[in-house]
């Protein structure tokens, strides 16, 4: 038999990022042209002061594990872990996001709250006949840095290419409540239909709790994560 050769493109990213007015206004756009629905991220942000940022649009949400907060190019391997792929899809949501960074001496905190569509990426479907279903998703996250903050940006990639000169540790926890999910992990819509005894649409509420730990020092990286999800209704 004759041999056949070929190759596939897993991802083909195009990213645009910028800021204005002394970094008070910002935007981020990312597309994956190897995907049938290329748009991944499209959001704008406003930072009235250094400790607070308000974003609106479709972006990587912080209500998942830390690995799901990382852009794909920041992962240790070519894809997310089996656990993260079980409990999440792309980790992107359409909505409003509020983030704050605070410090108390050497102790650091990242705080976040989000209200999103609850239907994941491209949540309003491919056409007007594929509408958003269920209610909104509410979530939040707290991350503590007991040894001080990482070098800028180094907490959002797995590998310690910067080689932190002193040990750095991030301990985080996130929770989300999705009202009326029609996707098995609350990151999609119209994947199944459920009805009450009167025949009206009745989708289950989906809750997810996660915890994670990221440690880096002098090129060494360690990431541990835990997820628990329940649905009822």
Per-range role (PLM):
Residues 1-121, 129-149, 167-170, 175-177:
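Outer membrane beta-barrel
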């Amino acid at each position: 038999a004759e041999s056949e050769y070929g190759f596939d493109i897993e991802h083909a990213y195009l990213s645009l990022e910028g800021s204005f007015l002394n970094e008070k206004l910002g935007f981020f756009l990312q597309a994956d042209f190897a995907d049938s629905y290329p748009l991944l991220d499209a959001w704008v942000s406003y930072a009235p002061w250094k400790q607070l940022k308000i974003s609106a649009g479709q972006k990587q949400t912080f209500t998942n594990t830390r690995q799901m907060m990382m852009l794909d190019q920041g992962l240790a391997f070519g894809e997310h872990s089996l656990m993260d792929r079980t409990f999440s899809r792309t980790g992107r949501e359409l909505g409003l996001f509020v983030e704050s960074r605070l410090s108390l001496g050497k102790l650091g905190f990242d705080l976040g709250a989000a209200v999103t569509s609850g239907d994941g990426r491209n949540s309003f479907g491919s056409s007007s006949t594929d509408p958003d279903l269920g209610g909104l998703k509410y979530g939040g996250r707290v991350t503590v840095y007991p040894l001080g903050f990482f070098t800028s940006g180094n907490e959002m990639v797995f590998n310690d290419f910067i080689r932190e000169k002193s040990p750095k540790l991030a301990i985080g926890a996130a929770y989300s409540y999705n009202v009326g999910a029609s996707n098995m992990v609350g990151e999609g819509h119209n994947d199944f239909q459920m009805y009450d005894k009167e025949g009206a649409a009745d989708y289950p509420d989906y809750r997810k709790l996660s915890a994670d730990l990221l440690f880096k020092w002098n090129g060494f990286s360690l990431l541990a994560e835990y997820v628990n999800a329940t649905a009822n209704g």
